[in-house]
A protein has these predicted regions:
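Positively charged n-region of N-terminal signal peptides that target proteins for export
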Residues: 1-4
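Outer-membrane beta-barrel proteins
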Residues: 48-52, 118-121, 155-158, 198-203, ...
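Outer-membrane beta-barrel "beta-signal"
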Residues: 421-437
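Outer membrane beta-barrel
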Residues: 26-57, 68-69, 74-199, 214-217, ...
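Extracellular loop and loop/strand-boundary signature of outer-membrane beta-barrel proteins
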Residues: 76-79, 114-116, 161-166, 202-210, ...
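Detector for outer-membrane/organellar transmembrane beta-barrel domains
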Residues: 227-375, 379
Length: 437
């Protein structure tokens, strides 16, 4: 027994000595957790002058529906409407306090009630990520973000009070990702891999993550930012590679059974540029995206099937579009805001061989599920007034969104609706009461 006690004492002494030596090499260890809850209660009242395409409870607004004339000559989509909702109420938690030498860890968990299950609002995950930061390399910072967070193409938002925050003129997406950044001086380089979850690319089976899952290539983003006290400039690009078919769903050419592996693939790149200026109570920003596809970013786009001669290797072309916005905000207690957005469909970069057909078959186009294949261009203006009384905000916003539609059955060899062009307008008025926690 005495021998065991002596051995234990010797081991304890060795551990204490090694721990003391180790503590001399580590500058600081801090395991204190700091939890900072945040969020807001938000109630919205909305008037629309006509039926429109919008997300849950008509809060996330996209565009007015095209005219649909009945036998009496009336437009059945001309239906003014009014509604109220509070499902965008949000809860979040910031976690900080873990530091180990020059290495620190923080995190975020955020959710809202913007998920309708029948007529019941349910909790929906928005963000859940961990940030790893190394900050003791002279003026250079290195960071890694892992988890679900804002897509880098979407992170810079226009100044407005609506739920869609500029979409579909501004990308809107948060997804699981691993994003690395390195900052030296005023410059930051960012790159990483992204996987679609809530905001999905489209294809023959509708919106699905499977086009990336079975394609074995993650979505990739890379960008560079320059920041000063009053100015921010950012350029970046999103790359996504899809397999519209990874196996056959039917017997092909009489020789290939159901489940035969296919070589289909389409890869698309969407570059982006962003500018922001801040001076006192005045803020202004602008963004433009030249999107190939872009439907997973809630932009009006997709791609088209162009050739099926090889039953195991269908050919596709991306639909190109240009989407931009400019916005401003002035004031603190009494705040004036405004956004102007414009989108133009540019079609395919190459002409499609139509063969004996006169126009492209719309069934061969895989398009954003909340848009329409015969859109030529869109525009939006949203003047906004807000009064901020401490944590309480009263806001009212007017939204005028216009869409130029064309004949869906007259798509040319670039997939553009060239006939019967006409503009449809919707006038939306939104009132918001918001209380920040």
């Amino acid at each position: 027994m005495k021998r065991l006690i002596m051995i234990a004492m010797a081991l304890s002494a060795m551990l204490l000595q090694s721990t003391g030596g180790f503590s001399q090499t580590v500058k600081n260890v801090n395991l204190t957790q700091h939890l900072q809850p945040y969020g807001f209660f938000r109630t919205s009242a909305i008037f629309d002058s006509r039926d429109s395409k919008a997300g849950s409870e008509d809060l996330f607004y996209y565009l007015p529906l095209d005219k649909s004339i009945n036998l009496n000559g009336a437009d059945v989509n001309y239906n003014p409407s009014f509604k109220m909702s509070a499902i965008t109420t949000r809860l979040g938690l910031n976690v900080t306090g873990f530091r180990y030498g020059d290495f620190s860890v923080s995190g975020k968990l955020e959710a809202d009630f913007y998920l309708m299950v029948g007529s019941t609002a349910s909790l929906r995950l928005r963000e859940a990520y961990v940030d790893l930061l190394w900050d003791d390399y002279s003026s250079t910072l290195f960071s890694i973000r892992a988890g679900q967070a804002w897509h880098p193409m979407s992170a810079d938002l226009p100044y407005c009070i609506n739920v869609e925050t500029g979409s579909p003129f501004n990308p809107f997406n948060w997804s699981p990702q691993v994003m690395a950044g390195i900052t030296f001086g005023n410059w930051t380089l960012t790159a990483g891999a992204i996987y679609p979850m809530q905001f999905l690319p489209t294809g023959p089976s509708g919106p699905s993550e499977n086009y990336v899952k079975y394609g074995l290539i993650p979505e990739i983003y890379a960008g560079v930012s320059f920041r000063t006290d009053v100015f921010l400039a950012r350029v970046g690009a999103d790359f996504i590679s899809l397999k519209p078919r990874w196996r056959s769903e039917e017997i092909l050419a009489g020789s290939y059974d159901v489940g035969t592996k296919t070589g289909d693939r389409i890869s698309m790149v969407s570059p982006m540029a962003y500018l922001q200026f801040t001076s006192g109570a005045f803020k202004m920003n602008a963004k433009t995206v030249l999107a190939q596809g872009g439907d997973h970013l809630r932009l009006m786009g997709g791609y088209v099937l162009t050739n099926i001669d090889d039953p195991l290797n269908y050919q596709y072309l991306p639909l190109v579009s240009s989407s931009s916005f400019v916005s401003f905000s002035y004031g603190r207690r009494f705040q004036i805001m405004g956004m102007a957005g414009y989108m133009r469909a540019l079609g395919t970069n190459h002409m499609i061989n139509l063969g004996d057909a006169s126009y492209v078959n719309p069934d061969n186009i895989y398009y954003f599920s909340d848009g329409f294949k015969n859109i030529n261009q869109m525009f939006r203006a949203t003047p906004t007034l807000a009064y901020n009384l401490g944590k309480l905000t009263f806001g009212i916003e007017y939204d005028c969104t216009g869409v130029e539609y064309g004949d869906i059955n007259s798509l040319d060899n670039h997939c553009l609706a060239i006939k019967d062009r006409h503009i449809i307008l919707n006038h939306r008025v939104m009132g918001v009461l918001k209380y920040n926690l």
